[in-house]
Amino acid sequence: KVHVQPYARRRFDGLRADTPEVITEETSDGTPYTITRHILGSAPAKLPIPTPQCMELGQLIEQLEEMPAPDRFRRITHMLVDAGARDFTWVDPTPSKIIETPPAISFTVSTAKFEGRVTILYDRGGDTYVVELHRQNGESVELVDRHDEVYFDMLGEVLERLIDDGRWRQIDVSILDAKAARKRQAVPA
């Protein structure tokens, strides 16, 4: 016997993306209540980043969460989950500091294509993004690759080319019962 596990989109917490969301809210008098929310046809993977004050960082987060990956089955954030994205950091500047400290999201991935740190930062001058790949080299961090002038609608393609190894397409098959196969015998006619 075997167990076949087809691909399922996941969230950053490891749960399936179509898992119901449980939210606790309060009424106007402070009484807490719980809501279990199922969003039909949607399987979001929200980035583990709080709501930013910088509009451009908010737009980057929205684009990563809402725009489809090049395969059209996943969103860009699902591609990041499949690449093992973790250890998220972000730069959320005030509007006056946006040039000297550009908004950015950085995370670590581990795939067959690339293992290291990925940074997506906003270039205010060109109204584009810059995607950088960094690798730990002993005590120092070295810049491995840099892609300038990445428009928002190119983010998925660039990230797929740099970090997506396609392993998500492989169906997981595991053997449950390793009994010796019975020998078949011919039945006389």
Which residue stretches match the model-derived regions?
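Preference for solvent-exposed, low-hydrophobicity sequence contexts
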Residues: 19-23
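Activation corresponds to long, low-complexity, non-globular regions
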Residues: 30-60, 174-188
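Negatively charged, low-complexity tracts enriched in Asp/Glu with abundant Ser/Thr
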Residues: 46-112
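N-terminal secretory/membrane-targeting helices
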Residues: 53, 67-68, 73, 86, ...
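Intrinsically disordered, low-complexity regulatory segments enriched in Ser/Thr/Pro
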Residues: 114-150
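Polybasic, proline/glycine-rich intrinsically disordered low-complexity segments
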Residues: 140-184
